[in-house]
Each structure stands twice: as structure tokens, then as C-alpha cells.
Design a protein with these regions (language model features):
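Acidic, glycine-rich active-site loops and adjacent beta-strand->loop/helix elements
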Residues: 63-65, 84-86, 120-131, 193, ...
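Zn-dependent metallopeptidase/amidohydrolase metal-coordination segment
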Residues: 12-25, 78-82, 349-399, 407
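His/Asp/Glu-rich mid-to-C-terminal helical/loop segments that flank catalytic regions of hydrolases
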Residues: 230-256, 299, 304, 374-412
Length: 412
């Protein structure tokens, strides 16, 4: 019976729209920053759904919430999940899809009278987006033991409120130690957040791993002076030096090729006046690659160019690392299972790495982990126009259902 089991597609879509009402923006989309009143409303909605399904709800000290559907045997659980916090101009699907699809999987099994050998669980992790508190993916990195709980709870937002205070304010500061549960495996269903599947008209992305990420912030200090009277040869122009670094970052990515990407996403210039040479710039460079050796090479070449530019332009440049995550390769057993199930269901598929960071990359250090992608229209995400077709959302959830069912019922 389970071989042909399918999720209730309309129930899944309805649940996504219902969750999207919490923090809904007037023009569409969602703003549900971590540990805000809007996040509390979203959390309450999901927890109510968990309880309606009879799940045991566990909340840990970083605010991660897990709903457990107990199995026939006391064994490590097969976990699904993602996050429900959003960016300030978020869509309905990023993160939310993986959480609600996980609950739909359990609802479908209950409808069919199936209780799996291993327990099933759905977790939503705190502060995946990292908008209000840094770093991003905070709940999962603490769960995996790769970031100190105390340090995470001490993180402050722009108003000086700590995450600890914010979680207490919304009633989601649990007592359990993060990661204090036996997890057999983890499968995260997610929209791609990129254009490949949509452009190639492919149903399922079989995610092989997550790119390594290097975020660096550069502060450049030059000398402000009159834009008309200062000869070009006598300038210490922080704006020019920053522009050269930005151009080099693009050229670096193109020269290294492969999966290397580079982005200058933040650029702040002072005094920011049309007739004054800039004396102060703060800028970011985001480097990513699936190959850690090449990512390290990119970091090295960028550092060398920055030092050279500082000397040539007479501009003091300091740097600090904001984020550094190594690439993650997902477990073959999960990757192969996703691929086989897509083929069995006659869905088109391709293997690809994730260009964005996800909770799965940290849970992969705890247990075998993997991800399933579905297309999003034009690759648009972190945007109120984010959209995935219902047929794609349903197809992805049906693949998740079967992969998780196989994991939970296996006899090894």
C-alpha cells in the first residue's frame, strides 16, 4: 500500500497559505523575522498542527521545535524539517515548504493507518535566515554542536535585545539541550532558490551537497578631499580602492570557473557626497564553492589583491571574517534514494549542489542527511514574488514521503 501512497496535495497547499497569513505583507509575501511576534504566531500555528496530529512537541534551549510521531520501536528518529523564519521581504515557500510538507507526510501516513518502525520527526530550526540575529542557520549549527549555545543566545539585534530575551518573550525558550535526541537521518525538502530547475524544466533536484561559504567584510580608510582640486595622482580614494576590489571579485570568480561565485552585496561609502573624495568604505565579499581547496585559493588571491590595492592607492584596509563554512557533501544513501524515487515516480531530475546555505548542512555532521529541491519560478527567492507551482510542490512532497518511509521502515 505504501508503495503507491501519495500526500494530500490540496491540504499541503492550504497549509502553506495558512502559515503565510502570519506576518503577511500588504503587497504579498511574508515578514517573519526570528523570535518576533510574527514568528511566535507562525510557531504557534505549526505547533497547533503538530498537536492536532498527536505529535510529542519538544522545544530546546535555542528555540528549535520538534514534533515526534512515535514509531513501533524505540529507535533513532528519521527527521524532516527546515525553518519558518523569513527575510524582511520573504515568500511563502522558503523553509516553510519543508516544514509543512514534513507534517503532511505524517498526516498522510496516519490517514493510511501506517505507523513506521522508526519514529518520524519534523523540526523547524530557529533563525535560519540570520536577519535579526547572526550568524544564520543558528538553530541547526547549535543543534549540531558546532557553535556554543551561550554565544548564540547572547547574540543581539539592532535594538540590543538578545536572542535569549527574544525567545523568552515569545515563550519559545525551551529547557532541552539542543541536539539531545537520537537522529537516524535527516531529509530536507526545499525550493531551489535558483533558476536551474525552472530553466531546464526539471521536476526534482537531487541535492549532492552545499557550497562552502566565505563572507568577509573590508573596511577602507582613505582621505576626504575636494573632488575638483585634488590631482588624481595625489588622492587616497577609499571609494576607488573598494571599486577595484569589487571588480576583482567578479574577475576572480570567472577565472577560477566551475562552481566559484563571488558577490559584493554590501557597499557603504562616506561621506557619500558628489563632490568629495570618499574617505571611508565598508564592503562585503561573499565567496562560495563546492570545492574547499578552490574556495581557499579564492580567499588567498582576494587577500593578496586587497594588500596590493592598499599599497597602490594609499588606503588602509582591514578585514574580518563574518562567516566561514566548509562545503558539505550529503550522504550517498540519501542522495541515491532521492534519485531512485524520482525515477520511480517518472519525474525528471538532475543532481546539483545547493548554492544557498541550509540547515541540512549542519545536521549532516550529526547523521546521514540530504535534500530535495523543487523548482521556483524564474529562480526568484527572498522576494515577495517567490513562487513554486502547486504541481511541483506536490511532486516534491511525494518524493519526500517515499524516501522517508523507506528510511523509517528499513530493517538494518
Amino acid at each position: 500500500m505504501s508503495h503507491y501512497l501519495q500526500i494530500n496535495g490540496q491540504r499541503l497547499i492550504d497549509s502553506l497559505y495558512a502559515l503565510g497569513e502570519h506576518g503577511a505583507l500588504p503587497g504579498g509575501g511574508v515578514c517573519r523575522l526570528a523570535a518576533t511576534a510574527e514568528d511566535k504566531a507562525g510557531r504557534d500555528f505549526v505547533v497547533a498542527r503538530m498537536k492536532a496530529l498527536g505529535l510529542s512537541v519538544l522545544i530546546d534551549a535555542i528555540g528549535n521545535v520538534t514534533g515526534v510521531y512515535h514509531g513501533e520501536e524505540t529507535l533513532p528518529m528519521v527527521m524532516m524539517g527546515s525553518h519558518i523564519d523569513t527575510v524582511a521581504t520573504g515568500g511563502l515557500y522558503d523553509g516553510n515548504y519543508g516544514v509543512m510538507a514534513g507534517l503532511e507526510v505524517i498526516a498522510t501516513l496516519q490517514d493510511a493507518g501506517i505507523r513506521t518502525r522508526r519514529p518520524l520527526a519534523v523540526t523547524f530550526f530557529t533563525n535560519e535566515e540570520g536577519v535579526r540575529f547572526q550568524p544564520d542557520m543558528m538553530g541547526s549549527v547549535v543543534f549540531a554542536g558546532e557553535y556554543p549555545l551561550a554565544q548564540a543566545l547572547a547574540a543581539k539585534d539592532i535594538d540590543g535585545i538578545t536572542l535569549d530575551e527574544a525567545l523568552r518573550n515569545i515563550g519559545y525558550k525551551g529547557e532541552r539541550q539542543p541536539g539531545d535526541m537520537a537522529v537516524d537521518s535527516y531529509v530536507e525538502l526545499h525550493i531551489e532558490q535558483g533558476p536551474i530547475l525552472d530553466k531546464e524544466q526539471i521536476d526534482i533536484g537531487v541535492v549532492t551537497g552545499v557550497q562552502g561559504i566565505s563572507w568577509q567584510e573590508f573596511t577602507l580608510r582613505g582621505v576626504s578631499n575636494h573632488a575638483g582640486t585634488t590631482p588624481m595622482s595625489m588622492r587616497r580614494d577609499a571609494g576607488l580602492a573598494a571599486a577595484k576590489i569589487a571588480v576583482f571579485a567578479r574577475e576572480l570568480a570567472l577565472s577560477l570557473g566551475g562552481n566559484q561565485v563571488a558577490t559584493v552585496g554590501h557597499f557603504s561609502v562616506k561621506p557619500n557626497l558628489i563632490n568629495v573624495i570618499p574617505n571611508h568604505v565598508v564592503m562585503s565579499v561573499d565567496l562560495r564553492n563546492t570545492d574547499n581547496a578552490i574556495l581557499c585559493l579564492a580567499e588567498q588571491q582576494l587577500a593578496e589583491f586587497v594588500a596590493k590595492t592598499s599599497q597602490e592607492e594609499g588606503v588602509e584596509i582591514t578585514s574580518r571574517s563574518l562567516v566561514r563554512f566548509n562545503p558539505v557533501i550529503f550522504a550517498d544513501e540519501i542522495v541515491n534514494a532521492v534519485e531512485a524515487e524520482a525515477e520511480r515516480q517518472a519525474l525528471s531530475y538532475r543532481r546539483l549542489p545547493s548554492g544557498a546555505g541550509h540547515d541540512a548542512q549542519f545536521i549532516a555532521s550529526v547523521c546521514p542527511a540530504g535534500m530535495i529541491f523543487v523548482p521556483c519560478v524564474d529562480g526568484i527567492s527572498h522576494n515577495v514574488k517567490e513562487h513554486s507551482a502547486a504541481k511541483d510542490l506536490i511532486a516534491g512532497a511525494n518524493v519526500l514521503l517515499q524516501v522517508v518511509l523507506q528510511r523509517a521502515q528499513r530493517m538494518d
